[in-house]
Amino acid sequence: MAKLTKRMSVIRDKVDATKQYDINEAISLLKELATAKFVESVDVAVNLGIDARKSDQNVRGATVLPHGTGRSVRVAVFAQGANAEAAKAAGAELVGMEDLADQIKKGEMNFDVVIASPDAMRVVGQLGQVLGPRGLMPNPKVGTVTPNVAEAVKNAKAGQVRYRNDKNGIIHTTIGKVDFDADKLKENLEALLVALKKAKPTQAKGVYIKKVSISTTMGAGVAVDQAGLNASAN
């Protein structure tokens, strides 16, 4: 058996894997145990009561967290004419059509989010093999294919998170940085859970949000007692 590092030994001693923690206690634990030499992200895993093998029970979408994620986001937009000008005014770093597609084909991908107006999808469609595996392909379900590209750019810059369940029915995303105030992390988590509840597939039966765990980039997961969260998020 591999020897635990000193840091992991401390985490194992502090975190009771069988316990669901009050959200305030959970956040306090994360802050106490976040000893990496960089500001760690706070990540969340939400186990959903869905059958991920069935396409009509998969959950996918996006929501803007009230306090953002703490990340600086670079946005690329496929648009032309007035839409292109609006995207630039909203703060998009890269805006174009065929010229932007050519950059991407050359491997120049200095961006975190790709947004496209519907009329630009004829160009973006050529990039599926490049953008798809990186999770960057624009999609109307998460608001990245839209006639209102300026609003989409503003949302991305404001701390929008995209979510999609994995094959085990678990959503993985981030809700901020460990140096955020505890109240801000809590409110971001509640906002995410509200969005997930709204996205509940009609075919999903039984308990929908089965388990919520939060962790830092380098830390262990801490299970959260949903009773301590905003009732509308449960």
UniProtKB/Swiss-Prot annotation:
<dbReference type="GO" id="GO:0006417">
    <property type="term" value="P:regulation of translation"/>
</dbReference>
<comment type="similarity">
    <text>Belongs to the universal ribosomal protein uL1 family.</text>
</comment>
<comment type="function">
    <text>Binds directly to 23S rRNA. The L1 stalk is quite mobile in the ribosome, and is involved in E site tRNA release.</text>
</comment>
<protein>
    <recommendedName>
        <fullName>Large ribosomal subunit protein uL1</fullName>
    </recommendedName>
</protein>
<keyword id="KW-0687">Ribonucleoprotein</keyword>
<dbReference type="InterPro" id="IPR023673">
    <property type="entry name" value="Ribosomal_uL1_CS"/>
</dbReference>
<keyword id="KW-0689">Ribosomal protein</keyword>
<dbReference type="InterPro" id="IPR016095">
    <property type="entry name" value="Ribosomal_uL1_3-a/b-sand"/>
</dbReference>
<dbReference type="GO" id="GO:0000049">
    <property type="term" value="F:tRNA binding"/>
</dbReference>
<keyword id="KW-0810">Translation regulation</keyword>
<dbReference type="InterPro" id="IPR005878">
    <property type="entry name" value="Ribosom_uL1_bac-type"/>
</dbReference>
<dbReference type="InterPro" id="IPR002143">
    <property type="entry name" value="Ribosomal_uL1"/>
</dbReference>
<dbReference type="GO" id="GO:0019843">
    <property type="term" value="F:rRNA binding"/>
</dbReference>
<comment type="subunit">
    <text>Part of the 50S ribosomal subunit.</text>
</comment>
<dbReference type="Pfam" id="PF00687">
    <property type="entry name" value="Ribosomal_L1"/>
</dbReference>
<dbReference type="GO" id="GO:0022625">
    <property type="term" value="C:cytosolic large ribosomal subunit"/>
</dbReference>
<keyword id="KW-0678">Repressor</keyword>
<dbReference type="InterPro" id="IPR023674">
    <property type="entry name" value="Ribosomal_uL1-like"/>
</dbReference>
<keyword id="KW-0820">tRNA-binding</keyword>
<dbReference type="GO" id="GO:0003735">
    <property type="term" value="F:structural constituent of ribosome"/>
</dbReference>
<dbReference type="GO" id="GO:0006412">
    <property type="term" value="P:translation"/>
</dbReference>
<dbReference type="InterPro" id="IPR028364">
    <property type="entry name" value="Ribosomal_uL1/biogenesis"/>
</dbReference>
<keyword id="KW-0699">rRNA-binding</keyword>
<keyword id="KW-0694">RNA-binding</keyword>
<comment type="function">
    <text>Protein L1 is also a translational repressor protein, it controls the translation of the L11 operon by binding to its mRNA.</text>
</comment>
